[in-house]
Amino acid sequence: MQPLSTELILIRVTGEDRPGLTASVTEILAKYDATILDIGQADIHNTLSLGILCKTEEQHSGFIMKELLFKASSLGVTIRFYPISVKEYEDWVNMQGKNRYILTLLGRKLSARQISAVTRILAEQGMNIDAIKRLTGRIPLDECDSRTRACIEFSVRGTPKDRIAMQELSLIHISEPTR
C-alpha cells in the first residue's frame, strides 16, 4: 500500500468578527483530521484576520475547501486558500533559529510618523516583523486627557546589520514633541 499524499494549505479568513467564527472553521478541519501547523488571529475594530496553515491528506483537501467556502459564505466572511510547497514550509521552519526581539514603543499617543520610523529602521536593518500588538487600552478620540498612554509591541526576527547604529537611529528619528 502506497503512503497517502499530503497537502499544505494556508487558509486566510477576513471579515466581521463574531463569537464562534474560529470554532466553525476549525471544526471543519477537525472533521477531516487536519493538522494545524500554525495559526494566528488579529481583531481590529471587529474586523477579523485569521490565518491557519494546515496539513491534510490530498484526498480530503477538496472537501475541506468546499465546506469552508460554504461556511464562509453563511458567515459573511471572505476566505482564501494558498497552496504551500514542502520546500516553502521547510524554509519557513528553518527560520526558527533566527534571533528574536521585542521592541516596545511608548508615548502619550503614537503617530503614524513614529510607527513609520520604527518600521523603516527595522527594514533597513534587515529585520522582519512577525507581530504588532497594542498593549494599552483603546485611545479615546478626545485627547484632552493627560493620563492617556499608548504602547505598541513589535515582535521582530533577524540579525540587525548594525545593532548599535540601529539603537542610536531609533532614539533620534522616532522622538516627537508632546502636543
Question: Predicted regions: what is each one?
Answer:
Residues 38-57, 85-88:
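Short, charge-patterned binding micro-sites
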Residues 25-29, 63-72, 118-122, 166-171:
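Short amphipathic alpha-helices in soluble, non-transmembrane regions
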Residues 12-21, 57-59, 106-114, 159-160:
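Short, surface-exposed ligand-recognition loops at beta-strand->loop->(often short) alpha-helix junctions
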Residues 2-46:
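The feature marks the first
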Residues 35-40, 80, 128-134:
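A short linear hydrophobic-aromatic micro-motif
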Residues 172-178:
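Residue-level detector of conserved catalytic or cofactor/ligand-binding positions
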